[in-house]
Design a protein with these regions (language model features):
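Helix-start/capping segments and mature chain N-termini
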Residues: 1-78, 94, 102-276
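Ordered, amphipathic secondary-structure segments that act as subunit-interaction surfaces
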Residues: 82-93
């Protein structure tokens, strides 16, 4: 792993360096991005940084210096990252040191860019619907914040039941998203995915799949989706297009014909440019 903190490459990323009063640490007052790298080159970095700005604005944080973020990305990828077939960048931007509690003080924000090598995701996976819901009207709906406790609990619930991802409905009972993925499904040959109005995150991979594969954005009850979908897949930065072979107690073709075409389209378009 390599890490860059507030302008400096860290000699040892495992050593304590962020203030214990950092609001990102104490109350989850921060935003982040996870960016895939391919042989040391970040994929769709500009799109990720645009979302970082939107999330920061939604949380009321100062506007991040994106040139500074890019310098951090270059620093952690130089050398080691270039030799790795696949890696993950984690860009974390927090409110910085503040008084204990929810109230903010006047501390400067904290910016961390970290990178580590990862392995490609499996071609297919299983998912579990969880009993908790996403609040599409919540203050942080659609923002990629560091407040991930809800996702940790949901993912643990899914893993205990043999899944690699948890799937949420929203408070209206409609399909929303996974803990770190967007969900696509097929009905009567048509590719569909929940709209952003459902409260799901505007995933970078989601947006590209919608553009490249022509998915229709529609909000439907999760129970109906599970009953009628002929195939389904997850989309995320590190999973790309990953077929769902089992959803709760239902087996699905993995990949089905539409999922296979989406995966092939994704691979071809990704190979064309690193800044789609």
């Amino acid at each position: 792993m390599r890490a860059w903190l507030n302008g400096d490459l860290m000699a040892d990323p495992t050593q304590a360096a962020v203030a214990v009063t950092d609001h990102g640490f104490t109350v989850g007052d921060g935003v982040f991005e996870a960016v895939k790298t391919v042989h040391g080159r970040p994929f769709a970095l500009t799109r990720h940084l645009e979302r970082l700005e939107r999330s920061a604005a939604g949380l009321g944080l100062p506007v991040p210096d994106l040139d500074d973020v890019r310098r951090g990305v270059e620093a952690v990828l130089e050398g080691e990252g270039e030799d790795a077939p696949m890696g993950r960048l984690r860009i974390t931007y927090t409110a910085g040191p503040h008084p204990m509690g929810s109230g903010r003080g006047g501390g400067p924000p904290t910016l961390v860019v970290a990178w580590s090598e990862i392995h490609p995701a499996a071609a297919e996976t299983t998912v579990v619907t969880v009993p908790w819901t996403r609040n599409k009207h919540g203050a942080t709906a659609g923002l990629k914040t560091t407040s991930y406790a809800e996702n940790v609990i949901a993912l643990a619930h899914a893993v205990e039941r043999g899944g690699s991802e948890a799937v949420f409905a929203n408070t209206a009972g409609n399909l929303c998203e996974g803990t770190g993925t967007n969900v696509f499904y097929v009905v009567d040959g048509e590719l569909r995915t929940p709209s952003l109005a459902s409260g799901c995150l505007a995933g970078v991979t989601r947006g590209l799949v919608v553009e490249w594969c022509g998915a229709r954005e529609v909000d439907e009850p999760l129970s109906e989706v599970l009953a009628v979908a002929s195939e389904a897949f997850l989309a995320s930065t590190t999973r790309d297009v990953q077929a769902i072979s089992r959803w709760d107690d239902r087996d699905l073709p993995a990949p089905g014909p539409v999922t296979r075409q989406c995966a092939e389209t994704w691979a071809a378009r990704e190979a064309e440019t690193m800044e789609p």
